[in-house]
């Protein structure tokens, strides 16, 4: 029996976020292109070497990127929109596509399947010349070979997933464009094979959710590629779910190895294998370590999985690997010594997961006796965390048991509530607001750092936050916004902030993961039962309201987003954790309301991303996700207006869920997706308050009043003006003050123009 260890992808950002810092230094012209490329190469090779030193045999090459691996593939295949044609250098084109420029709108960005990573959406245009513009995987393969002597495993995004993630073509064009991808993929694979690549990983995560017709279509493409590259050793890699529905066909694809996810698709993949077996002439790559969470593996469970597989499959060749790329986990837990022993011992970040793969490999090749001590350690760790007092709170259990049906609904229906709210709030037609955060300047970040390091006192820090809050309340009044926000200057991250103030959470010092581009997040760790402790947002919100006669809205992050943007305990269902968070937020919302706050926004930007990949599993998730939001928000008076916000999602799938949230107003990202949600509303009605974002806050460019007015105009064709709000796409935390103020002034002017037009037409 031949067994190898492999990794699907390694975190890009560096142990001290060197990758992020290098990118941002280059963007701000602090380093030149030569220094940028040199530093990036050093980081890239350091990551390859780290995996080699951990004992990984099949080391991924080409998973490293300057921004996003889907963007890399788009550039490589010539999917470069014509609006970027005036840029000549590779990096100028590449970063303009990713980030936009003063005069160019960036390509759309959206969630990578149901993760919190974002990819740049490839754009197809008529007349596009599809060809292999740059064999980047080959360059990086040869680099690792020459510099480190590592014969790596090139990783590429497969043609079917790539085109399915792209936009700009009609369904009728799909098959034609797909066939046009054969030639560049043949060239790419031929050159890699000729250079000596022993195995090439071709990622096709979309295979988890294809129809039978689509799988047949994909198979034909792989047959066409195989015909031209008969000797390349291809590993067809799936992840994020099982391929159960199409497994029988997928195992006949002309590839030498198939990778399956036995963490997030364990039940389905095992069921398919028990029914259809696995070909003797292929290698089974077993995703047996969770690539999306941070907990130590249950080694006994993994070894039992292999025992089951060895009984049911014909092959004698296995690859031991994570369930997906380790992009979604922090790099190393060694710096987290501040954590309690029971929690620290239970964690496994990327480097620890690689060590687990090597342990499993040892057990499979040399017998479990070879890792007897490690197995005993793992069993003790799991027992300790399971029996922890933090995971067994009686008060949390009692609150959950006491829930009644009426805890999940508002007293009056929306139309009646909204009438009462209009009387109470006295807002104009087409009210303007922002999504919540304002620029976190260098001064804001530096002052917070000084406070955390004990350089300044609590009192000095609070005075600084109050000064920033007052400054931005005045800015908002001068701009002419209708509903104001306090600016969130006290918050580093919209999830971390709440986690720090709730029981059941813990925080890493260096547990960073990439969200999009150079933006990294440090997800909280939900390790115990979640419970309310004290007010979390009351002081800052009430202070902001005391400064103005205008309405100030409270700002909270919703239960499902806190759940989906955290590393979550894996010993109870996610639904139960979500309900615990919702009950804690319910306390906070009641406190805000009793403190005189009449508009409360509960953001759920991550509602869509938590959906399972398979449509058959959607209803169960949506039901408890919606119930969690309702549990958090339903105890307020009818006169209190509940807002929510969502961004970066395929909203067409969840229009019914959005409606079921029963929020009085929802604001949605629409400008970057170039009006797709507006198109959705042409085919369905939405009869509650809604704000469709009028400008993309992820780009530094300041859009004109006319651009925003155009989106308002389009929106009012599908939305009732009585319920329509005007706002940016998302929070403004990452933008500069000199970008934010003119953009908001243009937005308010666009709103005034739209009001005038409505009055004229009336």
Swiss-Prot record:
The keyword Repeat applies. One of its GO terms (biological process) is methionine biosynthetic process. Gene3D superfamilies: 3.20.20.210. L-methionine binds at residues 435-437, 488, 603. One of its GO terms (molecular function) is 5-methyltetrahydropteroyltriglutamate-homocysteine S-methyltransferase activity. Binds 1 zinc ion per subunit. Pathway: Amino-acid biosynthesis; L-methionine biosynthesis via de novo pathway; L-methionine from L-homocysteine (MetE route): step 1/1. L-homocysteine binds at residues 435-437, 488, 603. Its EC number is 2.1.1.14. It catalyses: 5-methyltetrahydropteroyltri-L-glutamate + L-homocysteine = tetrahydropteroyltri-L-glutamate + L-methionine. SUPFAM superfamilies: UROD/MetE-like. Catalyzes the transfer of a methyl group from 5-methyltetrahydrofolate to homocysteine resulting in methionine formation. Belongs to the vitamin-B12 independent methionine synthase family. This is 5-methyltetrahydropteroyltriglutamate--homocysteine methyltransferase.
